[in-house]
Amino acid sequence: MDLDKPSVWGSLKQRTRPLLINLSKKKAKKSPSKPLDLRVQHHLDRRLSLSVPDLLEAEALAPEGRPYSGPQSSYISVPNSLSTAGIVPKSSSSSLKQSEEELDWSQEEASHVHGVDTDSEEIYASPAEEWQAFSQSALDLHKPSLGRDAPEEHDKTHGNDDLNASMTSQHFEEESTLGEASDCVSHLPSPFAYLLTIHLKEGRNLVVRDRCGTSDPYVKFKLNGKTLYKSKVIYKNLNPIWDEIVVLPIQSLDQKLRVKVYDRDLTKSDFMGSAFVVLRDLELNRTTEHILKLEDPNSLEDDMGVIVLNLNLVVKQGDFKRHRWSNRKRLSASKSSLIRNLRLSESLRKNQLWNGIISITLLEGKNVSGGNMTEMFVQLKLGEQRYKSKTLCKSANPQWQEQFDFHYFSDRMGILDIEVWGKDSKKHEERLGTCKVDISALPLKQDNCLELPLESCQGALLMLITLTPCTGVSISDLCVCPFEDPSERQQISQRYAFQNSLKDVKDVGILQVKVLKASDLLAADFSGKSDPFCLLELGNDRLQTHTIYKNLNPEWNKVFTFPIKDIHDVLEVTVFDEDGDKAPDFLGKVAIPLLSIRDGQPNCYVLKNKDLEQAFKGLIYLELDLIYNPVKASIRTFTPREKRFVEDSRKLSKKILSRDVDRVKRLTLAIWNTVQFFKSCFQWESTLRSTIAFVVFLVTVWNFELYMIPLALLLLFLYNFLRPMKGKASSTQDSQESTDVEEEGKEEEKESEKKGIIERIYMVQDIVSTVQNILEEVASFGERIKNVFNWTVPFLSLLACLILAITTVILYFIPLRYIILLWGINKFTKKLRNPYSIDNNELLDFLSRVPSDIQKVQYAELKLCGSHSPLRKKRSTV
């Protein structure tokens, strides 16, 4: 058959081509994501297509070719001149260049264009066939002889890109990466292909929207009326610091980026002002700081504060144009696979393994100027890790004496940001000074004592920074499990053997966690599925599995190892549902204390809710293995616990407040019952019980020695150890009581919803009133003790001095044992001597006569002034 003559089927296609194009245009309007696919039919010669190199001329063309990075890349370079453009395939072994004959051939055959239908059932093709078909379609798109068809298809593809440009920054990056990894052609950057990097830094002097004189601000970034990003909420702060970075895709520069600030409340968000940025005024490839003044035409405030942010506008590099092949089944399979791989790599990117620990000891401040602040504290930040020191009263040389541990990564050590903050009497926070430390410039395994001068403030901070390498953290598959290798396990066990107890005391042990699978998870998506992944937390150490998409019974089969710094830490395994650029949805959680781990045994754990108090939907299968040194663990027990990273402060919750009040009541009731038991012994309510108690008291006090105190505590431990079943039953009963309390709380909430808001207010008022009374009693007791020694009431102070003098003489001549015996005999025989006597505590009775500070003000006598004379007032009325 002569290949130069078109077939009958080809001639029929050639005649019906205008009708097919018009039909495809109508379909493209309905579904702009499906562009028209055109092919060119070429005469076959000794090569398969233009994109396949002529191996006979490869040696002659190689010196003139262009370099190529590797065979795995599918990027094809297209020159700017489309009329003479040749598509050059790249090879890892040689570089090729098109000859003039090939260019003439490509131009000559540009007129033979018609649509080609491929087999839709073929999902996979050979690499040569993929390269041939792709290069053929790429050539068609750049032939000048296509006339109107090529620009129309180009516009359709750009319309599709316009739709993609309105997505979030995370999806935008995934699509661009997908374009690079799939078969595509490079074009000049499109006018809408911009990326805007926003660094939301802080707010200053924002308006008050809460009754307490503060606000809970957060920021929204809007473009064309759509919210592209929402920041986190900073509670009770008029000078919030967000320090958040987001990358947004920009469709056109003829737009305004709206920045709106809101105050978060329980029912609605109050508006705190807005500002805008004209995108066309931004300079390309340059980071500029913008201080945006907030305004609200409906508000009476003149100054609503400012928002400080950095903006950087860049042209998106590598703006590729994707073309859908007619083989839709094959494209959808490859696209979904690529997206899944991209999401997987993104998830694994978050699981960076740290290489060591940065131990920072905040010693003190020197000559720190606090201004009108009454309290001071320090914030430390390294990447996403944050710590906050304890708050001290204002002092020129505050002594913090605190230690914080950061993770460091060898590839990005980063800068340690240190900020000194102050609080005034109204609890408004203000940044006093800052300083920075380049961690990469510090030597390893060495204590670095640094005195860091503060910027924008007088004074300095004295700190001790130590960098210690860490090798105990890893993520692997089940086939390369570290503890499965006997030699490696023996080596790890030897490292934590008893003879190495005094070597590297901070390295207590190592934990291996096998995250096997989960089952029957909660469906978080509208499709009835979830995209679950696991987050493992041990103290401040966090590792994460990859995401299993569209599955309620995922199998991760990953192995994680953690270095143990405290044997009393708790491993928290949380299952989340990945939700794109939004916060992940909660699917369940389980907490496992390290000391409760049974080595090497697979366990099935029932997932709990966020508060870890009730069962949630789903199960998770874990296998835990723990190796540690008991001596190191014991030494670590008597050192301060590791501080947790700074998290968002918890807001007032009626449920939590009520629960805590009930807990205090139960403890107080237990103490009160113990006191009542001793009082019943003194009151001789039961003759047998009081007699036994009196005899035990006499024998104990007469034979008492100091070593008997720890011995009595040991007997208490032994008593509880010999009755484990009863102890377990009591603990189970306590947990059931807590669950019952929660169920009662839920029922009360339902009832309160029926009763209305008045009952809720009364319930909260009752709780707050109880807390208020307890605090008042505690404060009054402490103030009365202080006022005894301050001679507030001279009679009581003189009486106390007389009693203390007599007590001193008695203790000097009479042993303490006899004094306690006399006191006990008096207590036990008081009811026998006087059956109608009222039991009392003499010390508390004495202190009740001393006024508190509030009573001192109430009892103080006001001086009579002439203007306040009652006679003068009567005369003025006359």
Curated annotation (Swiss-Prot):
Look up and give the membrane topology term: Multi-pass membrane protein
Q: Where are the transmembrane segments?
A: 694-714, 794-814
UniProt KW Metal-binding keyword: yes
Which keywords fit this entry according to its UniProt record? Calcium, Developmental protein, Membrane, Metal-binding, Repeat, Transmembrane, Transmembrane helix
**Chief site of localization:** membrane
Binding-site list for Ca(2+) 4: D525, D577, D579, D585
Is Nucleotide-binding a UniProt keyword of this protein? no
Q: Which sites bind Ca(2+) 1?
A: D210, D216, D263, D265
Amino acids binding Ca(2+) 3: D525, D531, D577, D579
Q: Can you give the residue ranges of the C2 domain?
A: 177-292, 334-452, 486-607
Q: Name one GO cellular component term.
A: membrane
The cross-references to InterPro entries, in alphabetical order and at most eight, read: C2_dom, C2_domain_sf, MCTP_C
Q: Which domain of life is it from?
A: Eukaryota
Which residue windows does the record flag with biased composition (Acidic residues)? 737-746
Cofactor binding comment, as recorded: Binds Ca(2+) via the C2 domains in absence of phospholipids.
Subcellular compartments: Membrane
Give the required cofactors.
Ca(2+)
Instruction: Map out region (Disordered) in residue numbers.
Output: 20-40, 143-178, 728-752
An annotated Gene Ontology molecular function: calcium ion binding
Which residues are listed for Ca(2+) 2 binding in this entry? Answer: D210, D263, D265, D270
**Basic and acidic residues bias: where?**
149-161
Name the job this protein performs: Might play a role in the development of cardiac outflow tract.
User: What's this protein's family per the entry?
Assistant: Belongs to the MCTP family.
Could you identify this protein by its name?
Multiple C2 and transmembrane domain-containing protein 2
